[in-house]
Regions:
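Structured catalytic cores of enzymes that bind and process phosphorylated ligands/cofactors
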Residues: 4-6
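Helical element adjacent to the flavin cofactor pocket in flavoenzyme catalytic cores
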Residues: 22-30
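Conserved C-terminal structural/oligomerization subdomain of aldehyde/semialdehyde dehydrogenase
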Residues: 39, 46-163
Length: 163
């Protein structure tokens, strides 16, 4: 039964909670935490939804997957710069595009080097579609028929039965 006072579930374990805290402890002086930034005082591994703004492209929080309710915000002047920021990381699991301009959303989704791109939403998962990352975010796909194919190796064998 759902707990009505929980809006965001916990991170996976104590080590992950400590890892998230470490990222927030190391926020550079030029950046600012605009929301959250702390663990929730309750049983479990809960972290307050957190927004960190004014980060630079080479900052640790931009260049790593945090796996927590933490979002980083960077300014950009045009689509090309936004795509450079997004793709300028070694990971590529998932991304989101938020805009009222559907054409822009589709251009950016095409340009983003991520295994999953959500438009005007984040984290919906359906079993009919594959899920998996690009670059250092892993290999292969989960869910759907594509996930099954990750456990197979196709081999083509031909023989001459008259020999």
């Amino acid at each position: 039964m759902p707990n009505e006072d929980v809006l965001v579930g916990p991170v996976n374990n104590a080590n992950q909670l400590a890892r998230v805290k470490g990222f927030l402890d190391r926020v550079p002086a030029h950046a600012r935490v605009t929301a959250g930034g702390t663990a929730i005082n309750r049983p479990g591994y809960f972290w307050n939804p957190t927004v960190v703004a004014d980060l630079k492209q080479d900052d640790e929080m931009i260049q790593n997957e945090i796996f927590a309710p933490v979002i980083t915000v960077q300014k950009f002047t045009d689509e090309a710069e936004a795509v450079r920021h997004a793709n300028g990381v070694k990971y590529g699991l998932a991304s989101s595009v938020w805009t009222k301009d559907h054409g822009r959303a589709m251009r950016m989704a095409k340009a983003f080097d991520f295994g999953c791109v959500w438009i005007n939403t984040h984290i919906p998962m359906v079993a009919e579609m594959p899920h998996g990352g690009f670059k250092h975010s892993g290999h292969g796909k989960d869910l759907s028929g594509y996930g099954f194919e990750e456990y197979t190796r196709i081999k083509h064998v031909m023989t001459n039965l008259n020999a």
